[in-house]
Amino acid sequence: EIVLTQSPAITAASLGQKVTITCSASSSVSSLHWYQQKSGTSPKPWIYEISKLASGVPARFSGSGSGTSYSLTINTMEAEDAAIYYCQQWTYPLITFGAGTKLELKR
C-alpha cells in the first residue's frame, strides 16, 4: 500500500499570501489528485492528474510534482480557500488518501 504524507498538517495564511501544501508518497505514483473539503460538506475534486484544475476551481490554484513528491499551491490566498485539502492516488487495486492539510485564514 502506498502511503501519502501531507505537510503541514495544519497551517494559516493571510489574505494574498502564497500557500504550498506538499504530499509525499512512500513509493512512486504515476498520478496524483487533490480534493477540497469545507465544513459539513463532502470533499470536492479540486486538482486531477497532478496539475489539471477541476471545473470551477480558480486559476490561483496550481498543482505540480512527479514520482514521490507533489504539491498544491495557492498563488494568493482568499478567504474562501480556507478548507481541508487531501491528496489521493490510485495504484491498482488500492486508492489511498493523505491525512489532510487544514488551511485556515489568518486574521
Swiss-Prot record:
Keyword terms of this UniProt record: Adaptive immunity, Disulfide bond, Immunity, Immunoglobulin
Region listing for Complementarity-determining-3, in residue ranges: 88-96
Ranges where the record places region Framework-2: 34-48
Source species, domain of life: Eukaryota
Region: Framework-4, residue numbers: 97-106
Record's GO cellular component terms: immunoglobulin complex
Gene Ontology process terms (BP): adaptive immune response; immune response
Pfam family, any one: V-set
Miscellaneous comment in the UniProt entry for this protein: This chain was isolated from a myeloma protein that bind galactan.
InterPro entries recorded: Ig-like_dom, Ig-like_dom_sf, Ig-like_fold, Ig_sub, Ig_V-set, IgV_Light_Chain
Disulfide bridge partners, by residue number: C23-C87
UniProt-recorded name of the protein: Ig kappa chain V-VI region J539
Ranges for region Complementarity-determining-1: 24-33
Region (Complementarity-determining-2): 49-55
Organism field: Mus musculus
Keyword Aminoacyl-tRNA synthetase among UniProt keywords: no
Region (Framework-3), start-end ranges: 56-87
Region feature (Framework-1): 1-23
Matches recorded under PROSITE patterns: IG_LIKE
